[in-house]
């Protein structure tokens, strides 16, 4: 991945425009989950240490272009950064130029309010580019979208580079997918095979084993000839599951936890995979399966984790995901995890410091795993050549 890196540049006195991912949940004007801001702070500090004149922007929520509403504002992010000790201010009217003082951070208001942002209007890209000497793309979570603040600005800025977060993300994904230490094990959970089909196809060419979980596993259980009762599964994708299972080592659970209804209070019953009744639904893998899969993970040298193996939000159906999570945490393998539910499981079981790399991007993470080109990375590669 040959891109210019912000860490390698002399930024003294330069106007630096950082596209970060500060799309955080906000309630009553306060940030309710600060993970993305915390992840961006080292980039801001580095830019200040290098003597840059720092501008940073992001999208927040899904505003209507050209119609600014107070709830679309990045003001809560500015308040958070102020409380963290930064000299920071919000600039709403910035497209025709911004004055940035030494040592201050200017947060440029929500880019998605600007007309032409989403469809990557070149005129808007040029306006962003005119604000800076160096454009820094540091929002991996939006790298799969070609928009004016992720792609257009990179086309027209004097220099376009990858920020520390984006560079680390690309390095970690490259390490897991391009030349993984073997055995390489992928864990793919989620409700539907259809939404992860390209991920499964791509990983089947890379991974030594694929562990499937959630509704995806139910389709593979059905493909192996077992009754799945009322479980969520995709009957039309059984041929696809059979083909994947024939060409890749995909262990099917030997036992499962079932319930009669999808609720937190449902009674969990553990049983062999071939004993599921017509009125039962599979909500988790059983202990034997979890231990077998934990053993596979223990012997792995690379683990890519995307999705839980059961309905871990319900305590009765949490054990499978808990055992798998701790197996990954205790493994010596290089581990990379991504996706919203996966991050929630990591938080729940308190294992964040034991995962080698936690990806910040949901859709971008999956598209990279699928082998797709991420537009915002592609333009950085092009600009690095010229």
Curated annotation (Swiss-Prot):
Residues given in the record as substrate binding sites: 21-23, 36, 59-62, 112, 145
Taxonomic lineage from the root: Bacteria, Pseudomonadati, Pseudomonadota, Gammaproteobacteria, Pasteurellales
SUPFAM superfamilies from the UniProt entry: Phosphoglycerate kinase
InterPro entries in the record: Phosphoglycerate_kinase, Phosphoglycerate_kinase_CS, Phosphoglycerate_kinase_N, Phosphoglycerate_kinase_sf
Organism for this UniProt entry: Haemophilus influenzae (strain PittGG)
UniProt protein name: Phosphoglycerate kinase
Pfam families in the cross-refs: PGK (PF00162)
Compartment(s) where it occurs, according to its Swiss-Prot or TrEMBL record: Cytoplasm
Subunit architecture: Monomer.
Reactions catalysed: (2R)-3-phosphoglycerate + ATP = (2R)-3-phospho-glyceroyl phosphate + ADP
């Amino acid at each position: 991945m040959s891109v210019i890196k912000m860490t390698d540049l002399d930024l003294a006195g330069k106007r630096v425009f950082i596209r970060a991912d500060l799309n955080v949940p906000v309630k009553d004007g306060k940030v309710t989950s600060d993970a993305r801001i915390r992840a961006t702070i080292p980039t801001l500090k580095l830019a200040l240490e290098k003597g840059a004149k720092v501008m940073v922007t992001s999208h927040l929520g899904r505003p209507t272009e050209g119609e600014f509403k107070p709830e679309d504002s990045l003001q809560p992010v500015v308040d958070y950064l102020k409380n963290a000790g930064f000299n920071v201010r919000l600039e709403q009217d910035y497209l025709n130029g911004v004055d940035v003082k030494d040592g201050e951070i200017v947060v440029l208001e929500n880019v998605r309010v600007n007309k032409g942002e989403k469809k990557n209007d070149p005129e808007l890209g040029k306006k962003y580019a005119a604000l800076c000497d160096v454009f820094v793309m540091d929002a991996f979570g939006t790298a799969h979208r070609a928009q004016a603040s992720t792609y257009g600005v990179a086309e027209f800025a004097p220099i376009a580079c990858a920020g520390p977060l984006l560079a680390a993300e690309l390095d970690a994904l490259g390490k897991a997918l391009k030349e993984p230490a073997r055995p390489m094990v992928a864990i793919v959970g989620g409700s539907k095979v259809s939404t992860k089909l390209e991920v499964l196809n791509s990983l089947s060419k890379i991974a030594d084993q694929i562990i499937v979980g959630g509704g995806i596993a139910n389709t593979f259980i059905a493909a192996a000839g077992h009754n799945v009762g009322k479980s969520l599964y995709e009957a039309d994708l059984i041929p696809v599951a059979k083909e994947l299972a024939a060409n890749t080592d995909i262990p099917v659970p030997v036992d499962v936890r079932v319930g009669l209804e999808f609720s937190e209070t449902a009674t969990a019953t553990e049983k062999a995979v071939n004993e599921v009744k017509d009125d039962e639904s599979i909500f988790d893998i059983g202990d034997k399966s979890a231990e077998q899969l934990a053993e596979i993970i223990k012997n792995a040298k690379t683990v890519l984790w995307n999705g839980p193996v059961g309905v871990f939000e319900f305590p009765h159906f949490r054990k499978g995901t808990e055992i798998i999570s701790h197996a990954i945490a205790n493994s010596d393998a290089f581990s990379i995890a991504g996706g919203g539910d996966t991050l929630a499981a990591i938080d729940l079981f308190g294992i964040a410091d034991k995962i080698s790399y936690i990806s910040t991007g949901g859709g971008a993470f999956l598209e990279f795993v699928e082998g797709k080109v991420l537009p915002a990375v592609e333009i950085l590669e092009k600009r690095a050549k010229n």
